[in-house]
Structures are given as structure tokens and as C-alpha cells.
Amino acid sequence: MAQMYFYYSAMNAGKSTTLLQSSFNYQERGMTPVIFTAALDDRYGIGKVSSRIGLQAEAQLFKADTNLYQEIAALNEVEKRHCILVDECQFLSKEQVYQLTEVVDKLHIPVLCYGLRTDFLGELFEGSKYLLSWADKLVELKTICHCGRKANMVIRTDEHGKAIKEGDQVAIGGNDRYVSVCRQHYKEALGK
């Protein structure tokens, strides 16, 4: 029976690497997965999912107004899809997460979503909030803080490496803008 999975973590835990490995596993068995990624995240090129260790694959883009159920149903009509993989799923809307539940429940295709749980202020992203609520399986991927403890928070930094305490929830960046830390070092960095 198809299920929806939410693989979540702080930055640099290997979410994209895990997604790409899952895609490879399906392909190795003669199955056809489809990868989606957020159109607004073009750090590694448009329509690509890339990992820090150099793995890469082409991806379909989703925008704020993309109807994922319709897109996936249309793709599935052309060629049977065995798995849907969604990178940067924190950028999904509530409606898009619901559409993915419909993919699982009506099309009977497993959906594996990979993304951040919280932003640099410790607040849930909309997509993450509804994935935490509606996913069948929650899987935490782990990374470590500079102190060696599990990192479960993300700090956004300025050009001098200082923690930023306000700003837009979405600001695309990588290691140049974000640092994954444990809760204690998150609070210390923000002066809490």
C-alpha cells in the first residue's frame, strides 16, 4: 500500500543525497520515479536536484501555483510512475501537500518528501507543518553541530558570520548563509 513519507532535518544532513539514492534504487529495479523540486531554489541550476557530494538528477519544477496531483496524474497517464520524490518540500503549500496525499490515496503511488522542518527563526515552514500532520511516516535525518551534538536548528548568518534574528522566511542559500546547530548553540547565537 502506498504511503507518504516526510524525511526532515536541519541543513547538511544529506536529504538530497538520500532522495537521489532512493531514485537510483527504483531505477535499478526497472521502475520509473519522478523527482520534483522547488522552482525558487536554483542554487545548482534550474530543474536539478544536487547533493553536496556531487550527485545530481533532473527534476520537474513545482511553483506556488502548481497542481501536483494534476501534474503527476498526467505523467502517470503517459508512463506508469512508481514513486514521487519531492526535494525542498518545505516550500510546498498546504494545498500542495494535500494534493500529494491524493496521489498516495487515489493513484496509489508512494510519495517521499525531503526538506527542512523549521526556518532560521525556529518556525515551521508551511509545507513542513502539513507534512508533519499528514504524512504516514516521519523520518528524521541527522546531522551534527560543531559541538558534536545533534543539530536540529538552523542559523542564518550575515556576511560576517553573525546570526540574523529577523527577515523573510525564505532566502535561498547554502553553507555561505546557513549553519546547522544544536538548540543550545542556536539560543546562544540568537542571544536567547
Swiss-Prot record:
The active site is at E88. It holds the Pfam family TK. Its main location: cytoplasm. ATP binds at S9, A10, M11, N12, A13, G14, K15, S16, D87, E88, C89, Q90. Gene3D superfamilies: 3.30.60.20, P-loop containing nucleotide triphosphate hydrolases. One of its GO terms (molecular function) is thymidine kinase activity. InterPro entries: P-loop_NTPase, Thymidine_kinase, Thymidine_kinase_CS. One of its GO terms (cellular component) is cytosol. Its EC number is 2.7.1.21. Zn(2+) binds at C145, C147, C182, H185. It is found in: Cytoplasm. It is an enzyme of class 2 (transferase). Keywords: ATP-binding, Cytoplasm, DNA synthesis, Kinase, Metal-binding, Nucleotide-binding, Transferase, Zinc. Disulfide bonds: none annotated. GO terms for biological process: DNA biosynthetic process; thymidine metabolic process. It catalyses: thymidine + ATP = dTMP + ADP + H(+). The keyword Glycosyltransferase does not apply. Belongs to the thymidine kinase family. Homotetramer. This is Thymidine kinase.
